[in-house]
Amino acid sequence: MKKVEAIIRPFKLDEVKIALVNAGIVGMTVSEVRGFGRQKGQTERYRGSEYTVEFLQKLKVEIVVEDNQVDMVVDKIIAAARTGEIGDGKIFISPVEQVVRIRTGEKNTEAV
């Protein structure tokens, strides 16, 4: 199994969720995160003064899937989250050794 973590723009969440649900993904975790990459932040104006927002609001979408679903999930996220502008986000893929459902004790595929 693999964990797919996607850092996306907040306004793209609904499109990403719909694309994944339509592809058969039945669960995901979404967290609010802040960070910066190549875009480094942005300059904003408030009451005539400029200031730099160094950490931009993003969302992290986490999904655990079988190995054979990873490419499909990544493709769906890219298609739904891409704007073509700097700041679209990143996708990280990492191995998952074990999953346990707390309520039932089910493990791995049965727990996802």
Swiss-Prot record:
PROSITE patterns from the UniProt entry: PII_GLNB_CTER, PII_GLNB_DOM, PII_GLNB_UMP
Swiss-Prot/TrEMBL GO biological process terms: regulation of nitrogen utilization
GO cellular component: cytosol
Chain positions found as Phosphoserine: S49
InterPro entries referenced in this protein's UniProt entry, alphabetically: N-reg_PII, N-reg_PII-like_a/b, N-reg_PII/ATP_PRibTrfase_C, N-reg_PII_CS, N-reg_PII_urydylation_site
Mod. after translation: Phosphorylation dependent on the nitrogen source and spectral light quality.
MF-aspect GO terms: ATP binding; enzyme regulator activity
Pfam family, one: P-II
Keywords, comma-separated and alphabetical: Nucleotide-binding, Phosphoprotein, Transcription, Transcription regulation
Modification O-UMP-tyrosine occurs at: Y51
Subunit-level organization: Homotrimer.
Function: P-II indirectly controls the transcription of the GS gene (glnA). P-II prevents NR-II-catalyzed conversion of NR-I to NR-I-phosphate, the transcriptional activator of glnA. When P-II is phosphorylated, these events are reversed. In nitrogen-limiting conditions, when the ratio of Gln to 2-ketoglutarate decreases, P-II is phosphorylated which allows the deadenylation of glutamine synthetase (GS), thus activating the enzyme.
Family: Belongs to the P(II) protein family.
Protein name: Nitrogen regulatory protein P-II
